[in-house]
């Protein structure tokens, strides 16, 4: 993997490196170490040229595609997904819907009740939903999504979360919806 450290130069100069090696050290003795100048003081060991080339190509692809086009595509997918998912009996989508649906990002957290559920029927457990969708070849995230206090406040143990991006299609959303319905019919 690869990451990017971006920050104000004055703060980066004051920050100590978190690991050592390679060209990040200017001089070293038993008594003292002098770190190299920016950006080298944060580059321990041999740079990962393959990963940096891959990152450069990925950024180039994003720029060629256009961030506005990507945002438009994700927005269309999200609206399509919300509309399709709302048609599912017993579906509860977390986040803005209705007239505020345009405020929803390309991440949809949801829970769903079994078919024929009453208002008091519990929702299908998010881990059951996620595991069974996985068996159908559909990837969703389940759990509290590093937001356990929010889940507690909402009164839920966890949710299923579907995310959409540049490479997703409406057909994949249709597959997700059919998968949710199939899992729902098992309970």
Regions found by a protein language model. Give the residues of each.
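Pyridoxal 5′-phosphate
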Residues: 1-187
């Amino acid at each position: 993997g690869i990451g990017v450290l971006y920050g104000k130069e004055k703060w980066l100069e004051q920050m100590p490196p978190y690991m050592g090696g390679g060209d990040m050290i200017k001089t070293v003795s038993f008594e003292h170490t002098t770190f190299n100048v920016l950006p080298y003081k944060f580059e321990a060991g041999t740079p990962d040229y393959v990963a940096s080339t891959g990152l450069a190509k990925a950024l180039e692809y994003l720029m060629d595609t256009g961030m506005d086009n990507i945002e438009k595509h994700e927005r269309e997918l999200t609206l399509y997904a919300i509309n399709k998912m709302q048609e599912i009996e017993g579906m509860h989508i977390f986040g803005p819907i209705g007239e505020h649906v345009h405020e929803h990002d390309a991440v949809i957290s949801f829970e769903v009740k079994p078919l024929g559920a009453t208002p008091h029927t519990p929702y299908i457990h998010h881990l059951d939903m996620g595991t069974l969708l996985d068996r159908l070849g559909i990837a969703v995230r389940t759990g509290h999504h590093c937001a356990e206090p929010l889940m507690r406040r909402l009164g839920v143990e966890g949710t299923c979360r579907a995310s959409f991006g540049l490479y997703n299609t409406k057909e994949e959303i249709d597959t997700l919806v059919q998968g949710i319905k199939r899992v729902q019919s098992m309970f």
